[in-house]
Amino acid sequence: MNKLIILLIAFFLFNNCSFNENSRIWKDKDKELLGEPNIKKVFVKKKSVVREFNQNLNLDLSGIKTNFKYMNNRNDFGSQSYKGELKKIGSYKFSKLDELNQINFKPLFIENDIVFFNKKGSIIRYDENQKILWEKNHYSKAEKKLQPKLDFIFYKDSILVSDSIAKYYSINANNGDLNWSKNNTYPFNSEIKKYKNKFFVIDYKNTLRCYKIKDGSECWNLPTEDSFTISNSKYSLVILDDMVVFNNSIGDITAVDIESGLIVWQLPTQSTSILNETYDFKTSKLVSDGSSIFFSNNKNEFYSIDIKTGTTNWISDINSNITPVITGNLIFTVSDEGYLYVIEKNKGNIIRVTDLFKNYKPKKRKNVYPIGFAIGNKNLYLTNSDGKLIVKDLQNASILKIEKVSSNIVSKPLIFKNNLYLVRSGSIIQYN
């Protein structure tokens, strides 16, 4: 009798708790699993609340050194000589550049002359009175339709050029005649840097290329990890001693021996998921004071890296893809939201934060972002996406002037020989 009772109980349990797909227990478990899908968001920006900080702090800029250099291999321009009258004194005109969402190329200054390009890739040299000295085009009819964007660097009596359609060449600076011309496999996406008899440039495949100035032949190339999408920002490089240090579309910082092209060190700053995110990932230019490299990105990271070892000195929570400026022991940068940060260079401490967009109404402010800035003497000159120029006294928290300088997109301010220049779609405007 007892055995019969045990068998009946066992049969009842197995009938209600079966292991088939219709079992209630397992159906509930499936619901629990289905309720937690394995979904991963790519490019999740950290959200941080930014507020003004230390507004009553006056900076001691009495020991600030004025820099007269327009170009250098460290991108370290510091404070430049400019009094800031902001009176328009000249306009260098050229055919408008189409399909622009940013102006991240700049003119070449040779003594008192300016060299730039138009929408068909013609290179133009102007004198100090805005008169054209010569204009030359070294592109075929088909290439002109691609509207190449050019980057320049000056070397002795030559101008070295790299462009957005994979050409690089050298021309005579005095008349624009072609010295030599070559093609790369992929378009270029960086500024040009030169060192002794070589020059360096990065292409869209994240490859650093070294060429000989004499004839354009390749010395070596160093490919780094590629991304799945095309970057929307320009890459950057600096040269210090016997090393070239550059970034790429996925946030890697790589130091390379100039002579051999071998890697000295490499620092990944982003996770592997960045491979799918590079169109939205933006970073500033690299800037160096000789011992460290500084840069920031739009993922709330401002880095200081040791130049010799590639180790991280510090990281600050700042959201910016604008090139920082170093003056003495201070670093200045502007966040994507329009806040001016003053940072202690050696430790990364933020010592003051000022809202430069406070005069914008909230609705308007959402659609405005900073383009770039320069420091002239003790003032900051910032251009915005709405064509306005903001002038800020760096010693205190006061905004000196807000001026409309363009009806559409404009470049960051460029200071050369006590004048300020702004590149627009069809002209370069000069201010004293």
Give the positions of each predicted feature.
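Extracytoplasmic beta-rich repeat domains
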Residues: G63-I64, I89-L108, I132-K156, L178-K196, ...
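Short loop/turn segments that connect beta-strands within beta-propeller blades
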Residues: D127-K131, N172-G176, K212-G216, I258-G261, ...
